[in-house]
Design a protein with these regions (language model features):
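A ligand-binding cleft/hinge motif common to bilobed small-molecule-binding domains
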Residues: 121-135
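Glycine-centered hinge/linker elements that transmit conformational signals in sensory
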Residues: 16, 20-25, 54-55, 61-102
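Short helices/loops that flank or line small-molecule/ion binding pockets
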Residues: 20-25, 103-117
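Acidic, glycine-anchored loop motifs typical of Ca2+
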Residues: 7, 30-39
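Conserved C-terminal helix/tail region of periplasmic/extracytoplasmic solute-binding proteins
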Residues: 172-179, 189-266
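Extracytoplasmic/periplasmic substrate-recognition and gating elements
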Residues: 93, 131-204
């Protein structure tokens, strides 16, 4: 590697193609002649996190039309999306990449048998939120998901599925008051709590070097909220699954999208 990932990010060269070039051929067989979780890889990923590549390309599933009404984003079925599906499929099928539908794929990274992983930030504190016996003891770096191409304006980051949502009982006699209270709490937390999470927890506890702090600023600055992911069940889960399934299976995204479109629109 001529430049480190940090340098590539700062020089606007951290693109999907560069990332793929780095990881796709790094592989060492454990000795049984078959690709498995016991081998060494350039990159590993828990399959649900494949969604991050769609977001990183600046694509959302649901947007708004000129009237402000919700509609399927044209990017969701556009050329960039179709190309991204193809690129990710090729990456997933390369020798140096291993993916599975289990979070146990993290073990490969924790055991220092993978160069890179795409995952939630909390994994640096342990295998998962309930068990820190495999806390990372080696030096690591954190960078945003790679851009689709260098002409993309910024690095984009999707939010993981664990998030909190609040609801107000439809029978409440104080819906307006409850709504105002929730809005005020959310606004205050955004201004006072969220910055502390980044400045104290992430930039200190979840960083192994000073440059990681710069990366967290880029990651936070590019956070993308896609209503199609947040309310996926409303859209038959297609807005959350179409990209990932086509990328893993190598099936035609255009065909799958055409079949799912009536369900999404309904």
């Amino acid at each position: 590697i001529e430049k480190t990932p940090y340098q590539l990010v700062k020089s606007n060269e951290w693109t999907f193609d560069k990332f793929s070039e780095i990881v796709k051929d790094i592989y060492e067989d454990a000795g049984d002649g078959a690709k498995s979780a016991d081998d060494k890889f350039g990159y590993v990923i828990y399959d649900i996190n494949i969604d991050a590549f769609q977001t990183a390309a600046g694509i959302v599933s649901i947007g708004k039309d000129e009237s402000g009404d919700l509609t399927i984003s044209p990017d969701f079925s556009g050329e960039r999306q179709i190309d991204m599906v193809s690129k990710v499929n090729q990456l997933l099928n390369s020798q140096g990449v291993y993916y599975t539908n289990s979070i146990k794929v993290r073990n490969v990274f924790f055991e220092e048998r993978a160069l890179m992983i795409t995952d939630r930030v909390f994994i640096v504190a342990g295998k998962d939120n309930r068990d820190d016996k495999n806390r990372i003891e080696f030096s690591y770096g954190i960078v945003p998901q790679p851009k689709y191409s260098a002409d993309q304006e910024s690095y984009m980051t999707n939010v993981g599925h664990p998030y909190t949502m609040y609801a107000i009982n439809a029978a409440s006699s104080k819906i307006d008051a409850c709504s105002a209270l929730l809005e005020a709490m959310g606004s205050e937390n955004y201004r006072s709590v969220t910055p502390k999470v980044f400045e104290v927890a992430m930039k200190v506890r979840y960083a192994s070097d000073s440059e990681a702090g710069e990366m967290y600023d880029l990651i936070r600055g590019g956070i993308s909220f896609d209503l199609g992911r947040l309310f996926a069940e409303t859209f038959g889960n297609h807005t959350a699954n179409l990209f990932r399934k086509a990328a893993m299976n190598g099936t035609s995204y255009t065909t799958n999208y055409s079949a799912a479109k009536p369900v999404i629109e309904s």
